[in-house]
């Protein structure tokens, strides 16, 4: 018992983000034991290649989802529809491209899909007071049907050099999706940390009634977080569809909302709302993709990914449990009193 209390106290004294960074390092080191030259990176045809670069590239769509999900969860909400929004945006992009629309019109159409989906979720939660998990579940279910209606139940393929570059090209030696994700993260950080928006979001998550009494337009704040989440989900859908040069309404973004939620929770944002850190959420996505890659490199079946993720969710939620935290505080006080 005393060893557990000392370990807990030691972890709490570490700088913020140390636990996530340590977890990522451990995952990568374990991967290096099962894969030869895991840390090797080489430049070929103006682009970096290697297992580490592959992890960055593969986690880009989930990282985009986690940016929006972080803001939504910080308000005390949740967005289960991001995977379906990815499917709708990918289907919209493919349809508009095949119909001969210009790229600016295609991108405007895709972003419009993200905004509309975000507004739908936001209004259901903030205006009609529907529980976030129920409100977003509606679009999660209906969204795939909408995507299938757009594609008429088929996988639509297209061929466009610019879109191909967005999905599988390179920019400044790194995969284009990685660069886009970093730019999105930087813009989000500026938006929430260099303006009052971040403080308003945290205030709503901590105590929405107190925030409203303080003069904060709480419905507008909640709706804005869902709109941002919808936009990032739409961009993620573009990347996934552009990567395979096609729109698969059935599988695009399937269950990625769970990875995004897990990444945010691993990053330290409580599902009850409140303080958040987008950079730690991105670390969470790297940890998840590192685990996925390690399982594949080890030769285990991909289904083990879901088992491991479920175990991680259980551990993280237990660590955030108010009952467990209260028990730790009580035993710490009792221990200090005993020593005195």
Question: What do the PLM-derived regions correspond to, one by one?
Answer:
Residues 12, 42, 128, 132-195, ...:
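Transmembrane helix-bundle core of multi-pass membrane transporters
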Residues 31-32, 48-99, 123-130, 264-278, ...:
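Single transmembrane alpha-helix segments in multi-pass membrane proteins
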Residues 37-54, 147-150, 192-198, 226-263:
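Inter-helical junctions in multi-pass inner-membrane proteins, predominant
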Residues 1-33, 186, 206-209, 213-220, ...:
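Cytosolic-side transmembrane-helix boundaries in multi-pass membrane proteins
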Residues 16-17, 103, 132-134, 173-181, ...:
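Loop-to-transmembrane alpha-helix initiation sites
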Residues 233, 244, 248-310:
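Transmembrane alpha-helical segments in multi-pass inner-membrane proteins
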């Amino acid at each position: 018992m005393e060893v557990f209390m000392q370990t807990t106290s030691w972890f709490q004294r570490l700088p913020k983000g140390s636990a996530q960074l340590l977890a990522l390092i451990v995952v990568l080191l374990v991967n290096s034991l099962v894969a030869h030259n895991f840390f090797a990176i080489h430049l070929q045809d103006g682009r970096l290649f290697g297992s580490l670069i592959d992890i960055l590239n593969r986690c880009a769509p989930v990282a985009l989802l986690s940016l929006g999900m972080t803001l939504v969860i910080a308000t005390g909400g949740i967005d289960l529809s991001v995977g379906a929004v990815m499917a709708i945006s990918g289907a919209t992009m493919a349809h508009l491209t095949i119909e001969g629309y210009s790229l600016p019109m295609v991108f405007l159409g895709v972003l419009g899909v993200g905004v509309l989906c975000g507004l739908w979720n936001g209004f259901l939660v903030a205006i009609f007071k529907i529980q976030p998990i129920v409100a977003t579940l509606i679009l999660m279910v209906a969204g795939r049907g909408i995507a299938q209606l757009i594609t008429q139940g088929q996988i639509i393929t297209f061929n466009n050099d610019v879109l191909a570059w967005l999905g599988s090209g390179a920019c400044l030696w790194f995969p284009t999706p990685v660069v886009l994700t970093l730019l999105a993260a930087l813009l989000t950080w500026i938006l929430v940390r260099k303006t009052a928006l971040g403080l308003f979001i945290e205030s709503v998550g901590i105590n929405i009634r107190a925030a409203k009494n303080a003069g904060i337009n709480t419905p507008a704040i909640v709706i804005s977080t869902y709109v941002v989440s919808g936009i990032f989900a739409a961009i993620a859908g573009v990347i996934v569809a552009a990567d395979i040069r096609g729109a698969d309404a059935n599988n695009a973004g399937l269950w990625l909302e769970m990875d995004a939620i897990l990444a945010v929770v691993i990053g330290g944002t409580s599902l009850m709302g409140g303080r958040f850190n987008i950079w730690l959420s991105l670390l969470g996505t790297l940890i998840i993709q590192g685990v996925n890659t390690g399982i594949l490199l080890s030769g285990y079946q991909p289904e083990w990914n879901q088992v491991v993720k479920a175990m991680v969710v259980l551990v993280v939620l237990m660590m955030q449990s108010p009952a467990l935290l209260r028990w730790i505080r009580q035993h710490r006080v009792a221990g200090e009193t005993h020593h005195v």
